[in-house]
């Protein structure tokens, strides 16, 4: 998928209406930052050609600001693409809600953005369930790109219990 298509799809997601759902009660931002690997997600058109996604979540000065770098390997040709965004915490009580805005020339002045919520996470922050506020898309982020199938199944059960769509699962790890 071309970068322009990815950015256009990301911008379109920003226009979708948000519905209120519960998210994780508290997120310790010091433990949440760092490198994550996307190991499972539901099918979405924005990422249809993406595998082995890696997310770097890096603090940027203020306590509620982050730089995001999503590295994706395209399935079709193995080409690596990096999408960069800035994130800010939008709920400082729970620290579980973020607004991601694309950076660079095609950021549309910061208008191309999307809300993401942390719906669940391991006590030791070894994994997290991220999703859109309306639950139409979700991702399992893990610290270990080679998480066992048994652990994946346990986390997927939690995703199912949270009410996310489970129709078309995509295993995105190695």
Q: Could you say what each language-model-derived stretch is?
A:
Residues 1-8:
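Bacterial N-terminal signal peptides that target proteins for export
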Residues 8-17:
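Bacterial N-terminal signal peptides
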Residues 19-174:
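A beta-rich soluble binding module of mature secreted/lumenal proteins
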């Amino acid at each position: 998928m071309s970068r322009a298509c990815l950015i256009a799809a990301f911008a379109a997601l920003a226009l979708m209406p948000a519905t209120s759902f519960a998210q994780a009660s508290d997120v310790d931002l010091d433990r949440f930052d760092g490198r994550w690997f996307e190991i499972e997600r539901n099918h979405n058109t924005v990422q249809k050609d993406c595998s082995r996604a890696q997310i770097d979540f890096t603090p940027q000065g203020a306590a509620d600001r982050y730089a995001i770098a999503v590295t994706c390997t395209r399935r079709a040709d193995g080409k690596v693409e990096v999408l960069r965004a800035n994130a800010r915490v939008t709920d400082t009580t729970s620290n579980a809600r973020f607004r991601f805005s694309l950076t660079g020339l095609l950021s549309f002045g910061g208008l191309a953005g999307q809300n993401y919520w942390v719906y669940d996470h391991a006590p030791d922050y070894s994994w997290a369930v991220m999703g859109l506020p309306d639950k139409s898309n979700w991702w399992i982020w893990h610290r270990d790109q080679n998480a066992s199938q048994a652990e994946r199944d346990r986390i997927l059960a939690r995703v199912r219990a949270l009410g996310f769509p489970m129709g078309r699962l995509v295993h995105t790890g190695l």
